[in-house]
Amino acid sequence: MDQSVAIQETLVEGEYCVIAVQGVLCKGDSRQSRLLGLVRYRLENDAQEHALFLYTHRRMAITGDDVSLDQIVPLSKDFMLEEVSPDGELYILGSDVTVQLNTAELKLVFQLPFGSHTRTFLQEVARACPGFDPETRDPEFEWLSRHTCAEPDAESPKPREWNSDPGTRSGFAPIGGSRHQSRNARRGLEDVLPRGPGYILLWGGAAEEPEFLLAEEMHEGGPVRGRRPLAGRRDEALEEADWEMSAGGGSRERDCAGVSNVDSSRPNGRGPDQPSGARCPEKPENSLTRQNKSKSDMSEKVRSATVTVSDKAHILSVQKFGLRDTIVRSHLVQKEENYTYIQNFRFFVGTYNVNGQSPKECLRPWLSHSALAPDVYCVGFQELDLSKEAFFFHDTPKEEEWFKAVSESLHPDAKYAKVKFVRLVGIMLLLYVKQEHAAYISEVEAETVGTGIMGRMGNKGGVAIRFQLHNTSICVVNSHLAAHTEEYERRNQDYRDICSRMQFPQVDPSQPPLTINKHDVILWLGDLNYRIEELDVGKVKKLVEEKAFQTLYAHDQLKIQVAARTIFDGFTEGEITFQPTYKYDTGSDDWDTSEKCRAPAWCDRILWKGKNITQLSYQSHMALKTSDHKPVSSVFDIGVRVVNEELYRKTLEEIVRSLDKMENANIPSVTLSKREFCFENVKYMQLQTESFTIHNSQVPCQFEFINKPDEESYCKQWLTARPSKGFLLPDSHVEIELELFVNKSTATKLNSGKDTIEDILVLHLERGKDYFLSVSGNYLPSCFGSPIHTLCYMREPILDLPLKTVSDLTLMSVQTADDRSQLENPMEIPKELWMMVDYLYRNAVQQEDLFQQPGLRPEFDHIRDCLDTGMIDQLCANNHSVAEALLLFLESLPEPVICYSAYHSCLECSGNYAASKQIILTLPSFHKNVFNYLMAFLQELLKNSANNHLDENILASIFGSLLLRNPARHQKLDMAEKKKAQEFIHQFLCGPL
């Protein structure tokens, strides 16, 4: 657990705690707990000096009051840090790291917890060392004089020197400079240092080599980094979490609107003991910087407990598993029951659609209704902000308001740490745990999936947080699915999209990402928007009044869809004993009296999946009247696997000993069920899958698809193998799926013939041979991914043309196309574009939410086929599906409507309509025609805005990033560029063409 925040509170202006680690100071036979903090001081000339601050503490270091400064060790040129390990003792994988700190006057020995957090700490120390150059000025450390250390104990035992006892030996090369050690001497040490078990070399401090060398020598295959954190590793277990401590609302007597008397995480906020002039800690700059930061003024309610390793910078230092590590890890998973036991934790899960409102009432009737304080809070919101600014620019002050309201209303009988929060437009999820459990949370990740049109819009979709609690993996999902009673199939599709696209990176970057279903426990909450069907409004209200919930529940769309196993397969929902939570008149308990008069429905739901889960309550909270929804909560007892550390080490040692006895010289070999794969008639954005099975023989083996010489990936961009690597136990097998999917990135080369559906995959066995797999097939050219000028020269459908003609026209340059137009008679715009626009003009000019709702996935295939075959008369699709197909068509253009060459000019004159029109006139004729045609169509839509609810801002936001794309093809527009692009398009929507 990185307790740098507690250290930061003891520092003065100009000092910043980069990182901290909990350790044990070894003095002879005694062991004393110490908190080590790396502190940086910035001098007036922008130079930096560093020192190690050593603190004693009586309890977990959460605030500055919990620690007492014991000793300061400046990082001068004679500073060195090296690992020492007991000679002759059995090396235990995952054991603590023993390091020795050496200066000219001091020698101290510490034990630090095994894990990547300790590695990160050592690397930060390495970077902070002043270097080996004897001509470099030695730091003066005048700033340290303002600190007073505690008086040392009388007759404290002399620290053991690294060579004073025969029981220790060096395992680390020095971190830091030495007046008597040259660069060559350091390099020479690499050849003479012993290469015993667990040796790691970390070079740091060289002025000429700011990057350190990380090389690891493994013990019979190397250290094991288990799939899950080891209980008791309080520092390591928090390296992935984003904590902030909450007072949980203070005492029972404290009013909900009162101010908590705890430290603030707000930059200009103060805790009760801080003077009014106390400065805020400077923003972290190391690899522990938070990824999803809370806003700077989320104040007065939370206090920091530690900093998160939310980004992936630290992963660069994580060792990669070898074959032996994989075997050990596999055996540990198989024998998990030998060293774990089940312990129940109480989870509060809540969901609230707040309809864009600010918090107006205390949330305790919802969040603190139970007598016992929950161990974990999972709190989800939907429709946090309904403004267009939040919709298009993803920024909202409501985030801070609701975060503060939740923090004030947590159960008053406990203190809580905020682990993580994540937001996608109006969908927000907060995760808190009790302070005493914070040390056992790890591997925290947050991800979002938008299911709005083209996956761009975040008005609908899902957010999720995954984490490890002790030895159990948990995923919490908050989703807001498509609205309207008749749109249940779109809701089903939203659910499937969230499940397929929500992926969490693993600590080991070589491992494939985790999906929602790859967790032991899944909690799914949110406004799922499933309605009550086949009953009119009056009948629904009558059944509610009679409390005939079971009769009403039989008509619930979610129940019907789950029973049909189309969604939430394997999930469970508790019995519903409360009245529908939607739709009410805001500020009351009265059903909707608006013109639409929505029928009551259980839109807000909580489901779960996993073992050892008991639901204790499932209810709505009628006391809250801020929104047109009522909040819903569920309390669970969830059995979590907790590691018995002694049994874990015993199991680990048994596994290592058994592997040591395995002397198998056989080369691993496998048999493949299939080696040749043919994908016929591949179409744009239509997934094709082929599978084969790898059967292993008698030797454990690790397999991986490897890159061919001079290639950056193991396969072409349109192909993916799942999984692309893995481990097989003896006599086991695994099925590999080869997925072929052509998208905007690959379609143009396939249309032109520069690329073909042909590839060779190399399947490599660790310590074994390579197997070659042949992939072949044919691609059906499509208007998607074809240049504008190419399509203008195609008077016939693209699938009716010879492949040679399609290839030649696709490879033709824009300038050549313009020159040829004088001799030939091309169309002014692509016929495919006209087909889609004409369809929308005839059927959808008054369609509500056009270009804002996604279409149905199967209908895109139908639309694409109609365009590519020219059978426009057979086109019959949902208006939203055709609208999305139009956007996908524009997105797939290899050269956007406004050519890349004009991109920067367009941004520069985005406020000058006359200059903007002049730029359009300079475009190639086909591009100019398409632009004018689209603007005329969009202006026609705006004439019907009373019915379709479109306005210039919405259309400019949607089409701005499609018509104006950054020349750096894979670079997304930043916010400033995005606004300028929208402003450029906005001019043409409002002005005459």
Curated annotation (Swiss-Prot):
Residues 821-993 form the Rho-GAP domain. GO terms for biological process: flagellated sperm motility; in utero embryonic development; phosphatidylinositol dephosphorylation; regulation of protein processing; signal transduction; spermatogenesis. It is a peripheral membrane protein. It is found in: Cytoplasm, Cytosol; Endoplasmic reticulum-Golgi intermediate compartment; Early endosome membrane; Membrane. Its EC number is 3.1.3.36. The record marks 852 as: Arginine finger. Residues 149-163, 294-303 have a biased composition (Basic and acidic residues). Keywords: Cytoplasm, Cytoplasmic vesicle, Endosome, Hydrolase, Lipid metabolism, Lipoprotein, Magnesium, Membrane, Metal-binding, Methylation, Prenylation. It comes from the Eukaryota. CDD domains: INPP5c_INPP5B, PH_OCRL2, RhoGAP_OCRL1. Mg(2+) binds at residues 355, 383. GO terms for molecular function: inositol-1,4,5-trisphosphate 5-phosphatase activity; inositol-polyphosphate 5-phosphatase activity; metal ion binding; phosphatidylinositol-4,5-bisphosphate 5-phosphatase activity. InterPro entries: Endo/exonu/phosph_ase_sf (IPR036691), Ig-like_fold (IPR013783), INPP5B_PH_dom (IPR031896), IP5 (IPR046985), IPPc (IPR000300), OCRL-1_2_ASH (IPR048869), OCRL1/INPP5B_INPP5c (IPR037793), Rho_GTPase_activation_prot (IPR008936). The modification Cysteine methyl ester is found at residue 990. SMART domains: IPPc, RhoGAP. The keyword Metal-binding applies. One of its GO terms (cellular component) is cytosol. Residues 669-782 are annotated as: ASH. Substrate binds at residues 383, 459-460, 582-583, 596-598. Detected in kidney, liver, brain, lung and testis (at protein level). Detected in kidney and liver, and at lower levels in brain, lung and testis. A lipid is attached at residue 990 (S-farnesyl cysteine). Residues 149-191, 236-304 are annotated as: Disordered. PROSITE patterns: RHOGAP. Belongs to the inositol 1,4,5-trisphosphate 5-phosphatase type II family. The ASH (ASPM-SPD2-Hydin) and RhoGAP (Rho GTPase activating) domains form a single folding module. The ASH domain has an immunoglobulin-like fold, the Rho-GAP domain lacks the catalytic arginine and is catalytically inactive. The ASH-RhoGAP module regulates the majority of the protein-protein interactions currently described. The ASH domain mediates association with membrane-targeting Rab GTPases. This is Type II inositol 1,4,5-trisphosphate 5-phosphatase. It comes from Mus musculus. The gene is Inpp5b.
